[in-house]
Amino acid sequence: MRRRFCLAMIGCSLAAVGALPALAALGEDVSSVSTDRVQMHAQLKGTTSAAGFSVQEIENPRGTVVREYVNPSGTVFAVSWAGPSKPDLRQLFGSYFQQYVNAANSVRRGAASRRHFEVTQPDLIVESNGRMRAFRGRAYVPSLMPPGVTPGDIS
């Protein structure tokens, strides 16, 4: 009886998590950056502009810095992170999160290093690496990148 109750509670919890709206930034309008900041309890560190895009930088309470790259049409085309913990990737990837999960699950066990992980899909590139207290990564949607911007511009 107790086991059945525990399983029911786990099932309800998973269903509730799956029902949450996607509030993440990747592929979303620049206004989602504010949503990310609130959802991650982060502070805006600054906004910078470069040729063809702007970068909004936020820092969560654990010290992880997240940069969200916005193209001239106001769409977030890339995110990057660096710090002692990984940020909430579901929050940052939004509608691309399931594509990321599917690609990650298709990688054979043992084929990817624990310290370095890469997903390369036609419309989603994710690179993540690190160890305890030193994580970094980036994700971008090539079709949303402004002309002249390269993956090297996303740090």
Q: Predicted segments — roles?
A:
Residues M9-G18:
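Bacterial N-terminal signal peptides
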Residues A25-A82, R90:
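N-terminal secretory signal peptides
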Residues Y96-S155:
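Helix-rich interaction surfaces within compact, conserved domain-sized segments
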